[in-house]
Amino acid sequence: MCPLLLGWVRFEEGEQAAGLRDMETHIAAARRHARRFYFDYELLVFAQALLKSGEQERASEVVAEALEFIEVSGSRLYEAEAHRLKGACLAAMGEKDMAEAERWLASAVAISQRQGALPLALRAAMSLARLRCDRGQHAGAGADLRLIYGSFTEGFGTPELENAKVLLEEIASASPGKRC
């Protein structure tokens, strides 16, 4: 099995340190051997794990590397996810970066919609809605999410769409000035 995927599985099953080590070993080997097939995806998987483990600054550095790879290679397949993760990293780093985080997340929504990548648009819109809720901006928090959620015609039993529905309900019932 690919060390990156093995690391991801270990990470998700609770072996965070071992999982991160496996992923980092794979990324380092890919860098050494100039292996570039889906390298942006691999970097983003690693960045997501770093972010989940609380290593926001390190995750942000890995996302920056992925964004650079996307720019140089011209491969735009994971561009929206890179923008979403950049926004998530900034949001996790605190108040001073919230406006910039919102811009990155809005960009992720726009890119994924332009590409017709509805699942990525949903993920980005959920991140943007959560950020706006956390900032007490309930009025516009769910606008993009409602639009994207309404575009789905199937899959309503999937975790992503169920989570989106719950978030929309939380936004609708939230009091102004309070978190969703």
Residue ranges of predicted features:
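Helix-coil-helix junctions within alpha-helical repeat/solenoid scaffolds
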Residues: 1-180
